[in-house]
Design a protein with these regions (language model features):
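Catalytic-core segments of class I nucleotidyltransferases/pyrophosphorylases
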Residues: 80-164
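Conserved beta-loop-beta/alpha segment of the NTase-like Rossmann-fold superfamily
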Residues: 1-78, 100, 104, 109-117
């Protein structure tokens, strides 16, 4: 239980005691993506495990990714980091590839990385998204997989959005 809500990274850290002696991988999804299908997730989880990655995340692309963290890549298309919209520059806000908040981590790596996260951002929270940049800097095995159907991973944050999804 997350008594104090100090960000998505902090929320995942609340599972540390439960998972400290576990081996394997953990699938982390934000609670506002009810439309994601197991048939979309399972091949990505299988790919993550079979390639022995430390971290895999799902990305998507839409015309207006307002409200979402942006995927930052280098000139060769390699994932560098995720920047939350509140912290984006005007140029970064133009990026259409965004973070729906679906990650697969090796359990042993997720907590090592999360223990390094700081709160030096606009919200003063522990962002799970900061784990991506830290993993990249640590030369961990990471991959961002862009899915074709962004409708599966659109976040539902209002009753109007939920009604639209149900229709």
């Amino acid at each position: 239980t997350q008594v104090e809500q100090l960000g998505t990274g902090h929320a995942v850290l609340q599972t540390k005691e439960l998972l400290k002696n576990k081996k394997g991988h953990i699938l982390i999804l934000y609670g506002d993506v009810p439309n994601i299908k197991a048939s979309t997730l399972m091949p990505i989880v299988d790919d993550h495990i079979s390639n022995n990655r430390d971290l895999t995340l799902i990305t998507a692309e839409i015309d207006d990714p307002s409200g979402y963290g942006r995927i930052i890549r280098d000139k060769n298309g390699n994932l560098l980091k995720i920047i939350e919209e509140k912290d984006c520059s005007d140029n970064e806000k133009k990026i259409k590839e965004w973070n729906p908040g679906i990650y697969i981590f090796k359990i042993k790596e997720v907590f090592r990385i999360l223990n390094s996260i700081k709160t030096n951002n606009a919200s003063k929270e522990y962002y799970l998204t900061d784990a991506i940049g830290l993993a990249q800097q640590s030369n961990m095995q990471i991959k961002a997989i862009k899915i074709a159907n962004s409708g599966e991973v659109i976040g539902i944050n209002t009753t109007d959005q939920l009604k639209e999804l149900e229709d």
